[in-house]
């Protein structure tokens, strides 16, 4: 894969990851974390969001205030309010162009596991909500290699009234 997005437009992976690495179960989030959904909105609003088809289907509709770019191997997949492509490099080009038009300097990559794994080598930053729970799941975030990433910001929060578990928000930058 070529590097389609110039370094001036950061690639940021945004995910909620359980202590056991789980990010999904049966094409849905494996936990309820209302406070994290607010953080997710803050991190992605006004930016292009890049995701796989299954992630888009789990959300169920385009995220408002963001250009929704969906990567799918299914050539017949389409939807209103989204840009669909089968090519990840093209998706990054579209996201980069959208970021420039919007006057923002980053692309938010929001899943799923295959997209995270493929873009981890190109990512500039990780915005991870570490959910302190161990749910069953069938989808996992790729390992965060401590030789490649360092935590630059961290805050712990207890479970709120509409959260299933306490969390630690961590921003990782390249080591």
Spans of features found by a protein language model:
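Enzymes that bind and transform nitrogen-containing heteroaromatic metabolites
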Residues: 2-175
């Amino acid at each position: 894969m070529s590097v389609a997005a110039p370094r001036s437009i950061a690639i940021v992976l945004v995910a909620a990851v359980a202590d056991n690495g789980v990010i999904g179960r049966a094409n849905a989030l494996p936990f309820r974390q209302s406070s994290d959904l607010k953080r997710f909105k803050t991190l992605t609003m006004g930016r292009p969001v890049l995701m796989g088809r299954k992630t888009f289907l789990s959300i169920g509709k385009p995220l408002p205030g963001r250009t929704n770019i969906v990567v799918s191997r299914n050539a017949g997949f389409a939807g209103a309010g989204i840009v669909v492509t089968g090519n990840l490099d093209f998706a990054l080009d579209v996201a980069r162009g959208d970021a420039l038009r919007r006057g923002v300097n980053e692309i938010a990559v929001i899943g799923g596991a295959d997209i995270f794994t493929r873009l981890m080598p190109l990512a500039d930053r990780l915005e991870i909500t570490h959910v302190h729970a161990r749910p069953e799941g069938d989808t996992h975030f790729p390992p965060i290699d401590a030789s490649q990433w360092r935590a630059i910001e961290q805050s712990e929060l207890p479970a709120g009234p509409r959260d299933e578990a306490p969390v630690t928000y961590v921003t990782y930058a390249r080591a």
